[in-house]
Amino acid sequence: MEILRLAQSKKNIISLNMDLERDMQRIDEANQELLLKIQEKESEVQRLEHEITQTGDPAEDEEWEKENYTVMEREQALQELEEETARLERKNETLVHSISELQRKLTRKSQKIVRCEQGDLERTPEESKVKLQLLESSCADQEKELGKIMEDYVFVSQLCEDQALCIKKYQEALKRIEEELETGYLEREVSKVLSMDSEREKTVSLNEKDGFISNGALRFSKRIFRSLLFSTLFFIRLLGYLIFHLSFINPDLLVNALPKILSRDVLWKLRCFLFPSLTLETEDMLPH
């Protein structure tokens, strides 16, 4: 009967050990995933910080420093949580070690019980009764140790659940901070694009005004040049008609018209001015 109780206790301890190992493996996987997510968040935060330091004003930099300080505080809290997780893992390892020690003790005691049962056939009933009492006391001690181990296991499980809840809350907080950072970055980019568009529109409008003014000045200069050209051609044509008329039609037009238009003093001055160029020097051409 005692052997059956010990075997049942051994099975319970083995199942508890397996449950502890599975819980430890699940906690390790969750911690690995959390570490990967934290590394991704840190790289994303560094990238956003680099982009904001490249394109940002002092007010935005100050706001970014505040947000970065908040993120660093949360990362520090996560680090403390990881340290707590490591402490729980060490405690779990201690529990596993104690369970394995208890298993070895149970194995040794079961072997002793088997040997005692083999030797009980040769012993007296009084010795068997004393041995049975010793076995019962040892079983009671083992049950007490098993109760303590169960209490420790429940405590560790509760701590693991609390840790998972804290990790979930910190992940939600990090996600919210990341969304706020991305929203702020997008707002700054949109404002930058809008300012660039407004500046581009201003430059385009100024270029259009300058082009309109330059086109108007060009058209005005072309019109003036065309008028001067036509006037020059018109006067040249009139001068040609006058020369043709004086040369072939009426050579004495000026001789007949100038006395009627000008006074005698003016005619005399004009004659004195033009006479040297109109007289022919024939002295050298006459025969001697």
UniProtKB/Swiss-Prot annotation:
Compartments, as annotated in UniProt: Endoplasmic reticulum membrane; Nucleus membrane
Coiled coil ranges: 13-105
One GO CC annotation: nuclear membrane
Tissue specificity comment: Testis-specific. Expressed in spermatogenic cells of testis but disappear by the time mature spermatozoa are formed (at protein level).
Superkingdom of the source species: Eukaryota
Residue ranges crossing the lipid bilayer per the database entry: 227-249
Pfam families: TMCO5
UniProt keywords, alphabetically: Coiled coil, Endoplasmic reticulum, Membrane, Nucleus, Transmembrane, Transmembrane helix
Membrane topology term: Single-pass membrane protein
The name this protein goes by in its record: Transmembrane and coiled-coil domain-containing protein 5A
Organism of origin: Rattus norvegicus (Rat)
